[in-house]
């Protein structure tokens, strides 16, 4: 069966991959850049991440199951903890509303 997937972001690409592995003839249409909001750009000589900055539920989430079933290459996900960079210092991201308030 011929199938058109509209959108080459993470969901569209993973859907196309799964459909292709099931034997379908798949065409992905993307108006901008493949990867959607999950990509890096070179701006004034600096590599800047655009879009997704965290991927969760890697132990047994849907992304891991799709990659395990359909991908040729399984990325090595490393856990860095719940931190972000602000003014050259690492700041812990609060996990509860009470932590946000203090």
UniProtKB/Swiss-Prot annotation:
Give the originating organism. Methanothermococcus thermolithotrophicus
Listed Pfam families? NAD_binding_8
InterPro entries hit by this protein? FAD/NAD-bd_sf
Q: Which Gene3D superfamilies match?
A: FAD/NAD(P)-binding domain
Protein name (database record): Uncharacterized protein in nifH2 3'region
């Amino acid at each position: 069966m011929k199938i058109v997937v509209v959108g080459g972001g993470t969901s569209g690409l993973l859907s196309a991959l799964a459909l292709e592995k099931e034997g379908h003839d798949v065409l992905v249409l993307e108006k901008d850049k493949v990867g959607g909001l999950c990509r890096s750009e070179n701006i004034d000589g600096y590599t800047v991440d655009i879009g997704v900055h965290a991927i969760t539920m890697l132990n047994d989430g849907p992304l891991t199951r799709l990659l395990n079933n359909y991908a040729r290459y399984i990325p090595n996900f490393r856990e860095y903890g719940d931190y972000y960079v602000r003014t050259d210092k690492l700041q812990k991201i609060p996990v509860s509303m009470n932590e946000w308030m203090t």
